[in-house]
């Protein structure tokens, strides 16, 4: 059975059993992560079925950002994937299940589980790249809006004189997590892409800063200077 067969099997199952997830964790997200993972894996001798499966099930359990057990999401997702592969996909190669589950458990930023295989490193990078760039920008404000989080602190949007708090202000999430992601990348290509996409977020911050100052045609170069080295 080839990868296209398994991808079709997974998508069909998810469309019937995973329909009510937010846009940051839906089937389209899984598909994008898989597309990115294929690019990251292009020059490596890796098990693509392990990567495909982990990409499609890494968020099969995804607790809300404000859930007290949020950091356990990837562990719970790995446990659920193990069950699903054994019970719902009986023809899936049993010898690959633990490698899939490790890649899923290790993908999460909050779980802090080190990826020990090349497959797990690729899945982690592919998922983290989704948090950067234009898609990442859209996701931040979509998720924050759903949680009732303010866009930014109008008095101090970049937290120059206050502690960062991304539970109150969506923009703070750029500094608490997103701009740090390039430093966590496991693959050379992943790091390169992460730095490129993080720069897009910095440019957004610079444009926002200019607009808040009443300047609608330029960007705040002080913001670019302050944050461009974050990755």
Curated annotation (Swiss-Prot):
SUPFAM superfamilies in the cross-refs: HD-domain/PDEase-like
Occurrences of domain HD (ranges): 26-132
Name under which the protein is recorded: Uncharacterized protein YedJ
InterPro entries cross-referenced by the UniProt entry: HD/PDEase_dom, HD_domain
Pfam families with a match to the protein in the record: HD
Cysteine disulfide links: none
């Amino acid at each position: 059975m080839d990868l296209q067969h398994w991808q079709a099997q997974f998508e069909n199952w998810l469309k019937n059993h995973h329909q009510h997830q937010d846009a940051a964790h839906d089937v389209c997200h899984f598909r994008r992560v898989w597309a990115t993972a294929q690019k990251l894996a292009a020059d490596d001798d890796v098990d693509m079925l392990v990567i495909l499966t982990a990409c499609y099930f890494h968020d099969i359990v995804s607790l809300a950002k404000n859930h007290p057990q949020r950091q356990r999401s990837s562990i719970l997702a790995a446990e659920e994937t193990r069950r699903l592969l054994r019970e719902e996909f009986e023809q899936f190669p049993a010898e690959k299940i633990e490698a899939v589950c490790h890649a899923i458990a290790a993908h999460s930023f909050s779980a802090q589980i080190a990826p020990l295989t090349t497959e797990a490193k690729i899945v982690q990078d592919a998922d983290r790249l989704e948090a950067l760039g234009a898609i990442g920008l859209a996701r931040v404000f979509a998720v924050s809006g759903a949680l009732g989080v303010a866009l930014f602190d109008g008095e101090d949007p970049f937290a120059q004189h206050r502690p960062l708090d991304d539970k109150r202000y969506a923009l703070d999430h750029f500094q608490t997590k997103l701009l740090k992601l390039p430093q966590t990348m496991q693959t050379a290509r992943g790091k390169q892409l992460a730095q490129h996409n993080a720069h897009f977020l910095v440019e957004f911050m610079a444009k926002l800063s200019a607009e808040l100052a009443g300047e609608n045609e330029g960007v705040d170069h002080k913001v670019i200077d302050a944050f461009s080295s974050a990755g």
